[in-house]
């Protein structure tokens, strides 16, 4: 595995591959790999001739008071795992390499980022869209692989690819969960034992919602989204938390759906502690 930290070098490497007619997959990450990340890397290895994993903690997607400084950075461990899974290039630029001293450009995908996580994290998705755009330009991938846990981010990136005419395919991979159902996240490392147990309320709320929807559907009844949200909210309240949001939306437009329809997704966010905010989502009717 080759480690590259400069924009010029990654461009040169990709150009060599392209001249050989090789396809390229990109897995953008902020590091601190868990099994969810590794599933993305494995998928990239399966579908392309060459695989780039980017490892960059992107400062412009963190808001004031968020965990940029505390965000875990186990670089050596991440590097070893990427190499073990057959990564060809680990692209690990410094912040000053990605963003020059006079950097002024901001990419914004407006409508898709207005609600859900976007409502409580102003500027976050602009930061994600900007760094992803730069990575797409630098790495010129044929495929880019993202996880479905960051449901709103995935929808935004798909729209970004359409709007900016990127010649690449977005591949999504399912949420990777712990044995007890908790969606894997780099921020799970922050949880103490009590918080870790209570954090199960996210996946439990989704299961309660799905069970309710399936029962109503089997009975041939209309399923009001507000009823389902109330059921899910009760699970989170019982765990001692107030959800930041719970919403049932169209999986492509992210528009709220007044009644549950096939393909709708329930997405939710809960702040477990001051700097520990977890998200999860699930389709309700397939």
UniProtKB/Swiss-Prot annotation:
Its main location: cytoplasm. GO terms for molecular function: ATP binding; pantoate-beta-alanine ligase activity. It is found in: Cytoplasm. Its EC number is 6.3.2.1. GO terms for biological process: pantothenate biosynthetic process. Catalyzes the condensation of pantoate with beta-alanine in an ATP-dependent reaction via a pantoyl-adenylate intermediate. PANTHER family: CYTIDYLATE KINASE/PANTOATE-BETA-ALANINE LIGASE (PTHR21299), PANTOATE--BETA-ALANINE LIGASE (PTHR21299:SF1). This is Pantothenate synthetase. The lineage of its organism: Bacteria, Pseudomonadati, Thermodesulfobacteriota, Desulfobulbia, Desulfobulbales.
């Amino acid at each position: 595995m080759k480690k590259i930290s400069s924009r010029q070098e990654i461009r040169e490497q990709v150009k060599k591959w392209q001249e050989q007619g090789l396809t390229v997959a990109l897995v953008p990450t902020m590091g601190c790999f868990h099994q969810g990340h590794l599933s993305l890397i494995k998928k990239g290895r399966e579908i392309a001739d060459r695989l780039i994993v980017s490892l960059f903690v992107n400062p412009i997607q963190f808001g004031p008071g968020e965990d940029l400084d505390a965000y875990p950075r186990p670089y050596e461990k991440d590097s070893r795992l990427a190499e073990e899974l057959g990564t060809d290039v680990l692209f690990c630029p410094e912040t000053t390499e990605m963003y020059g001293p006079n950097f002024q450009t901001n990419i914004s995908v407006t409508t898709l980022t207005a609600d859900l996580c976007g409502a409580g994290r102003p500027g976050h998705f602009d930061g994600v869209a900007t760094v992803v755009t730069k990575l797409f330009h630098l790495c010129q991938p044929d495929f880019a692989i993202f996880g479905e846990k960051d449901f709103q981010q995935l929808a935004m990136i798909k729209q970004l690819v359409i709007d900016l005419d990127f010649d690449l395919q977005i591949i999504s991979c399912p949420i990777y969960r712990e044995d007890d159902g908790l969606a894997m996240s780099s921020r799970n490392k922050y949880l103490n034992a009590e918080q870790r147990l209570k954090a199960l309320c996210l996946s439990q709320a989704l299961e309660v919602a799905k069970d309710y929807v399936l029962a109503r559907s089997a009975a041939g009844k209309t399923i009001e989204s507000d009823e389902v949200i109330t059921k899910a909210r009760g699970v989170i309240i019982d765990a001692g938390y107030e959800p930041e949001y719970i919403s049932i939306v169209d999986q492509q437009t992210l528009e709220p759906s007044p009644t549950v329809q096939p393909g709708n997704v329930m997405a939710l966010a809960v702040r477990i502690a001051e700097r520990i905010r977890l998200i999860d989502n699930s389709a309700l009717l397939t």
